[in-house]
Amino acid sequence: MSTFQAIFLGILQGLGEFLPISSSAHLIIFPWLFGWKEHSLVFDVALHLGTLLAVLVYFWRDYIEIIVKGITQPKSDQGKLLWFIIVATIPGAGFGYFFENIVENVFRKQYLLIAVVLAVFGFILYYVDKTAKNKFTLSNMNILQAGLIGILQAFALFPGISRSGITMTTGLLLGLKKEAAAKFSFLMSAPIILGAGVVSLLKNIHDVSSQFSSFAIGFFTSAIVGFLAIHFLLDIVRKSGFKIFAYYRFLLAALILVVFLLRI
């Protein structure tokens, strides 16, 4: 893998992990568009660990307060968030553990299917953004809502859906304000990324030394871009919502269709 490819894929992961555009779809589609070889599993781990670092650094004060108050003051607003995050993590972690390899094998080269998923979820994102009644902050959230967000997060395994996209959309449907839905999506991302990253890293630890250069480049690029993506999304959500990401999904789906037809 060239340095350019490692940087480019790191940028895609950093953006796609936190913007509702599906990082997994981008990491499949763009190498296909450019005719690149499929990247290794250990490089994929590096990209995800980079975005984990991004969210931990961006929200480090929140995480410390959530953990401390979750233990010492579990009924406080911040204390409840710890248990909401735990509950929301369980369904996705379980689904990922049992079905991740199956989903990856089914979707790996199904470019048209990914295009369809991108477009369909784009319509859902647009509709929910336009019609949802955003009344509540995270302090109004309850554990059943957290559980529902977690259950639907499991579907993010399918390339084109987007973990951040489906969790934010579910939050909006449940009445959360846009910024609150985005923040909860980011906060609950750390455990699921950490769990998946550690499991994959342990399985492929022997490959790290031979691919250390691309591993390091992908890690730091996705971390830096991921940090900026979090800030960008929170800012754009305050101003204009999620519609811009729906439009992007439509354009990418159309591009995939055109390229696929030209290559027949």
Swiss-Prot record:
Q: Which GO terms describe its molecular function?
A: undecaprenyl-diphosphatase activity
Q: Is Membrane tagged as a keyword?
A: yes
Organism, as annotated: Caldicellulosiruptor saccharolyticus (strain ATCC 43494 / DSM 8903 / Tp8T 6331)
Spans through the membrane: 14-34, 40-60, 79-99, 112-132, 141-161, 182-202, 214-234, 242-262
Q: What else is known?
A: Bacitracin is thought to be involved in the inhibition of peptidoglycan synthesis by sequestering undecaprenyl diphosphate, thereby reducing the pool of lipid carrier available.
* NCBIfam families xrefs: undec_PP_bacA
Q: Which UniProt keywords apply?
A: Antibiotic resistance, Cell membrane, Cell shape, Cell wall biogenesis/degradation, Hydrolase, Membrane, Peptidoglycan synthesis, Transmembrane, Transmembrane helix
UniProt membrane topology term: Multi-pass membrane protein
Cell location = Cell membrane
* Protein name, as recorded: Undecaprenyl-diphosphatase
What's this protein's function? Catalyzes the dephosphorylation of undecaprenyl diphosphate (UPP). Confers resistance to bacitracin.
Question: What Enzyme Commission number(s) apply to this enzyme?
Answer: 3.6.1.27
Encoding gene per record: uppP
Query: What domain of life does the UniProt record list for this protein's source?
Result: Bacteria
* Gene Ontology process terms (BP): cell wall organization; peptidoglycan biosynthetic process; regulation of cell shape; response to antibiotic
Give the chief site where it resides: membrane
Q: Which GO terms describe its cellular component?
A: plasma membrane
Stretches of the chain forming a coiled coil according to its record: none
Reaction catalysis annotation = di-trans,octa-cis-undecaprenyl diphosphate + H2O = di-trans,octa-cis-undecaprenyl phosphate + phosphate + H(+)
Q: Does this UniProt record's set of keywords contain Cytoplasm?
A: no
Protein family (similarity comment): Belongs to the UppP family.
